[in-house]
Amino acid sequence: SSRSKKRIALTAALDRLHGRGIQVATEVLTLLREGFADAAFSRWRTLHEISVVAMVLGDHGEDLAVRYLDHDLVEAQRAADVFQRCHPKEAAQRKNVAELRQTKAEYDAVVAHYGPAFKSPYGWAAKHLGKEKPTFQHLEEAADQAQMRLQYKVASYGVHAGTKGLTSSVADVFGEGPPGAASIGGLHEAGIETAYSLVRVAGPLLGPNWSVDKLAGLKTLIKLRDAAAKAFSQGGRAIGEATWVSEDEIEAWQKEAER
């Protein structure tokens, strides 16, 4: 139908985001099974980014989705710039010169079409968010997910090489720094957030026109999400209670060790 044709780019973008979201959620599950809570939380960070983009696209529709997909040309040029800077000899080869020229021509055309604000990492959202250089935090606010900023920040500790990643860990139930191996501690954090983010990724796919089947499907997803979140929460609480150690017990162990 003509209505469905108007959502070609939006459907394509949301389908791809959903597929990638499922893949990342599977990675989270794999890490949880192996006891790597920090790594799982870091992968959830990616899933959160995917879900936020999906929600923003779902809210703003086809025009923004076209811009989002066209922004691939900007990313291609950024990669080309790095290639030429880091591998000048290879970049100077005839085959690569032709490809680089084509990439630059497509980049120039898309920037001329959308304007200079399109050049920034999230430039595809500049017009719709009313920001010259939108950031991911702006996307979170647009998706009504600003309350997730703290979780996102904590999850980032395990991604980068900052000192916070060396001194704290969601897996450490004793609060004395990150464990040196897999642990059962902290697994519930990534599990709960992943369950919620998966529903956020799937929601925009249902589109603006709600049918009985779509409502039933969404209701089922929410029930599964709530059940998973409850199970993870109960597991985390049980682990916390089982691993809690009083100061008296610690002091007694220290005295025993000194003998």
Where are these regions (language model features)?
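Secondary-shell segments that build the walls of catalytic and ion/ligand-binding clefts
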Residues: 1-6, 73-259
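Residue-level recognition of alpha-helical structural elements
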Residues: 10, 33-40, 64, 144, ...
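Long, hydrophobic, well-ordered secondary-structure blocks that form the structural core
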Residues: 27, 33-81
